[in-house]
Amino acid sequence: MEVITSIKEAKQIVKNWKSHHLSIGYVPTMGFLHDGHLSLVKNAKTQDKVIVSIFVNPMQFGPNEDFSSYPRDLERDIKMCQDNGVDMVFIPDMTQMYLKNFSTYVDMNIITDKLCGAKRPGHFRGVCTVLAKFFNILNPDIVYMGQKDAQQCVVVRHMVDDLNFDLKIQICPIIREEDGLAKSSRNVYLSEEERKASLAISQSIFLAEKLVREGKKNTSKIIQAMQDILEKEKLIKIDYIELVDFNTMDNIENIADNVLGAVAVFVGETRLIDNFLVQGLK
């Protein structure tokens, strides 16, 4: 496995692979890897070569968010990549990714102003800008992203279409702890009491998905059922609960096909997200 920190060197390796007609699966991460990331790597191994990038991107954090305290363990991440058959770990530093006087950004006027975008202004501009750079550097064939960041998946897919990137976005299922909590690097922030309270998040998601699959149509009643579960936990503060069209992120009044149920909450000081996606309803 190659551990690369230079953009120039990464591009050279990719160029060599492409000259031998090798396909590339790419998993973008901010590090502190967990089983959710490793499931993306497993999916990416259907390609000839697998690249994992590790970069805690300051541009997607707000001024009062957790950039400085975001969990980091590079040595552990590299070992996990090696143990799971990754071909290249790309770890550029800040000065390479954002040169002095950097002033070019990728932004859009739709999709990003809803859900997490409404609560975290500038977040998706940061995500799209850094991923556009990684796509240019690494030239992947398929990019593997987790459904837990469902809005991000839709936003990035939209960017790929708009800017004619020659790649595909593959959305992979949410990976959960045995008790249902969605895997997240931020789970490490939770105290024992907060960790217990956080189970209400997945419980609300599972209930809502069950109601949708049973044919319930009234979104306000489904949202209320989710809210009732979450509000039982005093350590949880709801950021949003939404039922939206998965492609547009527009709110829906009555359940139709392609529905995303999304939740964001604060458990103590830690912001966690979760969702369910139901497609193929008749």
From Swiss-Prot:
<keyword id="KW-0963">Cytoplasm</keyword>
<protein>
    <recommendedName>
        <fullName>Pantothenate synthetase</fullName>
        <ecNumber>6.3.2.1</ecNumber>
    </recommendedName>
</protein>
<keyword id="KW-0566">Pantothenate biosynthesis</keyword>
<dbReference type="GO" id="GO:0015940">
    <property type="term" value="P:pantothenate biosynthetic process"/>
</dbReference>
<dbReference type="GO" id="GO:0004592">
    <property type="term" value="F:pantoate-beta-alanine ligase activity"/>
</dbReference>
<feature type="binding site">
    <location>
        <position position="152"/>
    </location>
    <ligand>
        <name>(R)-pantoate</name>
    </ligand>
</feature>
<feature type="binding site">
    <location>
        <begin position="30"/>
        <end position="37"/>
    </location>
    <ligand>
        <name>ATP</name>
    </ligand>
</feature>
<feature type="binding site">
    <location>
        <begin position="146"/>
        <end position="149"/>
    </location>
    <ligand>
        <name>ATP</name>
    </ligand>
</feature>
<comment type="function">
    <text>Catalyzes the condensation of pantoate with beta-alanine in an ATP-dependent reaction via a pantoyl-adenylate intermediate.</text>
</comment>
<dbReference type="GO" id="GO:0005524">
    <property type="term" value="F:ATP binding"/>
</dbReference>
<comment type="similarity">
    <text>Belongs to the pantothenate synthetase family.</text>
</comment>
<feature type="active site" description="Proton donor">
    <location>
        <position position="37"/>
    </location>
</feature>
<dbReference type="InterPro" id="IPR014729">
    <property type="entry name" value="Rossmann-like_a/b/a_fold"/>
</dbReference>
<comment type="subunit">
    <text>Homodimer.</text>
</comment>
<dbReference type="Pfam" id="PF02569">
    <property type="entry name" value="Pantoate_ligase"/>
</dbReference>
<keyword id="KW-0067">ATP-binding</keyword>
<dbReference type="GO" id="GO:0005829">
    <property type="term" value="C:cytosol"/>
</dbReference>
<keyword id="KW-0436">Ligase</keyword>
<comment type="pathway">
    <text>Cofactor biosynthesis; (R)-pantothenate biosynthesis; (R)-pantothenate from (R)-pantoate and beta-alanine: step 1/1.</text>
</comment>
<feature type="binding site">
    <location>
        <position position="60"/>
    </location>
    <ligand>
        <name>beta-alanine</name>
    </ligand>
</feature>
<dbReference type="InterPro" id="IPR003721">
    <property type="entry name" value="Pantoate_ligase"/>
</dbReference>
<feature type="binding site">
    <location>
        <begin position="183"/>
        <end position="186"/>
    </location>
    <ligand>
        <name>ATP</name>
    </ligand>
</feature>
<keyword id="KW-0547">Nucleotide-binding</keyword>
<feature type="binding site">
    <location>
        <position position="175"/>
    </location>
    <ligand>
        <name>ATP</name>
    </ligand>
</feature>
<feature type="binding site">
    <location>
        <position position="60"/>
    </location>
    <ligand>
        <name>(R)-pantoate</name>
    </ligand>
</feature>
<dbReference type="InterPro" id="IPR004821">
    <property type="entry name" value="Cyt_trans-like"/>
</dbReference>
<dbReference type="InterPro" id="IPR042176">
    <property type="entry name" value="Pantoate_ligase_C"/>
</dbReference>
